[in-house]
Amino acid sequence: MVDAATLEKLEAGFSKLAASDSKSLLKKYLTREVFDALKNKKTSFGSTLLDSIQSGVENLHSGVGIYAPDAEAYVVFADLFDPIIEDYHNGFKKTDKHPPKNWGDVETLGNLDPAGEFVVSTRVRCGRSMEGYPFNPCLTEAQYKEMEEKVSSTLSGLEGELKGTFFPLTGMSKETQQQLIDDHFLFKEGDRFLQAANACRFWPSGRGIYHNENKTFLVWCNEEDHLRLISMQMGGDLKQVYKRLVRGVNDIAKRIPFSHNERLGFLTFCPTNLGTTVRASVHIKLPKLAADKAKLEEVASKYHLQVRGTRGEHTEAEGGVYDISNKRRMGLTEYEAVKEMYDGIAELIKIEKSL
């Protein structure tokens, strides 16, 4: 049973949300009926509904407002997660199944911008959760340390282009820290959304960063997800970037079992990343299209692309440079998600050239 203090917090949180003019998906789908059906439930990791909704209650202007404290939460609190997933992921219904993992034929992708006129850099990332561990809010300090140990020893076995160094955040020297900041590799303690979700406990225990010698392959350990794997480089050679990520993920998967669900695909802390978990993006200069926002948005929505400012969410495009990525992560394969970005960017470049 859920204890009285937690129930009290849940009731207070529900009242606060209900009285607010929050536009979040949490507010939209957490009806009294759903709330009453779920408030007494717990996962085997001990998570309650409160662990899922507290960030959205605290930050009423969240877009989504819900996180999964562990892999089981998606099943135990399905009455709330399912409609939110359906709303966010273009009608991915309760009865739908995410397709099995498929990286596709890497060779069919190419360089988006061989002349280097438009694409500044290219990046593909995915998220993974380690089986047998809850997500951030429910991890103990001992588990954080144990996970970091597993991850660093696994990564030390990577070879060839992926070979590199693991830097624990605990006890990191000022020089190393500065170097990682200069490289834009260092992640900071979570923002207020993650803080409110209790995703930053025991910081910096168990957190670390790995990168290969060329600084083109990066692994974040215990930032928002257990693992974030990132492949990136300057220019528009998506094939090279994608190929490197696929190799890295496959190598690591041989040694670390990942949380996967038949219906939802790979499991992540935030439901927006479920499924393929893949975000393929470019920093791209589109000075002419920048002057015609409507046209830019029209092409973006046709190819399911998300357009952000230069420094990611909630920022401006500096000097006409946009961060553009695939929006869809669920109900399609990894290859399809990346190919959608590839086709959309190719189209944007074609239009930019014609203006």
Curated annotation (Swiss-Prot):
Superkingdom in the source lineage: Eukaryota
Catalytic reactions on record: L-arginine + ATP = N(omega)-phospho-L-arginine + ADP + H(+)
An annotated GO BP: phosphocreatine biosynthetic process
One GO cellular component, as annotated: extracellular space
Pfam families, per database record: ATP-gua_Ptrans (PF00217), ATP-gua_PtransN (PF02807)
Enzyme Commission number(s) from the entry: 2.7.3.3
Domain Phosphagen kinase C-terminal: 118-355
Alphabetical keyword list: Allergen, ATP-binding, Kinase, Nucleotide-binding, Transferase
MF (Gene Ontology): arginine kinase activity; ATP binding; creatine kinase activity
Family annotation (InterPro entries): ATP-guanido_PTrfase (IPR000749), ATP-guanido_PTrfase_AS (IPR022415), ATP-guanido_PTrfase_cat (IPR022414), ATP-guanido_PTrfase_N (IPR022413), ATP-guanido_PTrfase_N_sf (IPR036802), Gln_synth/guanido_kin_cat_dom (IPR014746)
Family to which this protein belongs: Belongs to the ATP:guanido phosphotransferase family.
Protein name: Arginine kinase
